[in-house]
Amino acid sequence: MRTRLSGGVAGEAGRPVPLCRFFAKYTDCVIVLIMGVVGAGKTTVGRLLAGQLGWEFVDADSFHSAANVEKIRLGIPLDDADRAPWLKAIREAINRWIAKKQNVVLACSALKRIYREALDVGVDVKLVYLKGTYEIIYQRLGLRQGHFATEKLLVSQFAILEEPEGGVVVDVRQTPEDIVEEIRRLLGLKPD
């Protein structure tokens, strides 16, 4: 096996494999990444799931810089350059959780495939996509209080959304309790 300086090992066809994926068979933890556009219910479902399992809940919004938070508050869509340090910080946190064998439910938009690749979704990170139409999510946002989401932000997120090819897909028209039950069933998750 050939070691690579980039932090991975050589995999199939000589492509680098991130160390976390290489060592995943030795880990005893699960990171559940709940993705979707703003208003899909990531935080509500994530907190409920984490509470039922006795796991930690983390909202990826907490990894944003103050400048990003201000842009979001003003309704200015973030670009890939804005998101790069945010994704790096999240991946570093995931690596720490894996090293500590800590089960975590992470709410993160992860709208593009390249973002999910940066987070190394796969072996150690289980993806759950909260899927809903623009109309359903827009209606939900109108009912929310105390959140910085705007219609402009929702439009921009749907514009860049690349639906995942793998993972668990859950319809957001269900109650949060039903969504959590479906996630637990599909991923075989039991409390610690």
Q: What is each of the regions a protein language model found here?
A:
Residues I34:
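Hydrophobic anchor at the beta1->P-loop junction of P-loop NTPases
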Residues G122-R140:
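Conserved phosphate-donor/acceptor-positioning beta-strand/loop module used by diverse small-molecule
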